[in-house]
Regions:
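Ser/Thr-rich, low-complexity intrinsically disordered segments
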Residues: 1-8
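PRPP-associated nucleotide enzymes
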Residues: 11, 19-199
Length: 199
């Protein structure tokens, strides 16, 4: 009986360990960790794709994800920039399940109104597609510039498999839905005190 219990306990312990190991492995597999070098390379590929296929008159970035992308693209393509700020009503990230997004009242930009003729709307990724779809709707109804808009095209660095939105320009189309860990994301877990200590 003791031997039977020992074997049974060992079997249970093994199953617990195996499940734990599987969960860790799956968690790691579900992440796409992107280095600074990889990130810059993807942005450069996006710039080439845009240069070959479209002549926008202004770049509009969705904050915060598009901030570094639009900075680089504006320097390469020599175009004016604008920003729109969005958050979900529940404050838990941009794309909640109900699709409730809250837009800032104004676009932040030094671009002239007439520059909004051919817009390239930029985000870091197409996750569900909700943010890009809603942003297009919002831009079309934005009073100061809507009469100048003739065309809106979209660009992002990654498109996830389950996204319902197909961006016009996108260098990386994924065959899964990983959590994309971008180069600056670790700063969200660091306090200013920790940064001071290591500097």
């Amino acid at each position: 009986i003791k031997i039977h219990k020992t074997i049974k306990n060992f079997h249970n312990d093994f199953l617990i360990f195996f499940n734990f190991f599987y969960m860790i492995k799956k968690s790691m597999a579900d992440k796409l960790i992107v280095s600074f070098e990889e990130y810059i390379k993807i942005v450069e590929k996006l710039a080439i794709e845009i240069h070959k296929n479209y002549k926008p008159t202004v770049l509009v970035g969705i904050m915060r994800g598009a901030a570094p992308i639009i900075d680089i693209l504006s320097r390469i393509l020599k175009l004016p920039i604008a920003y729109i700020v969005i958050q979900s009503y529940i404050g838990k990230g941009l794309e909640d399940q109900q699709g409730q997004l809250m837009f800032a009242r104004e676009i932040s930009s030094l671009a002239k109104e007439k520059d909004f003729e051919k817009i390239l709307l930029i985000d870091d990724l197409s996750d569900t597609g909700l943010t890009l779809n809603k942003s297009i709707e919002w831009l079309k109804g934005y009073e100061p510039t809507k009469r100048f808009i003739k065309e809106i095209k979209t660009a992002c660095l990654w498109k996830k498999k389950s996204s319902s939105f197909e961006p016009d320009f996108c260098p990386i189309k994924l065959d899964s839905d990983p959590w994309i860990v971008q180069p600056t994301e670790h700063y969200e877990e660091l306090s200013i005190e920790e940064i001071i200590k290591r500097n």
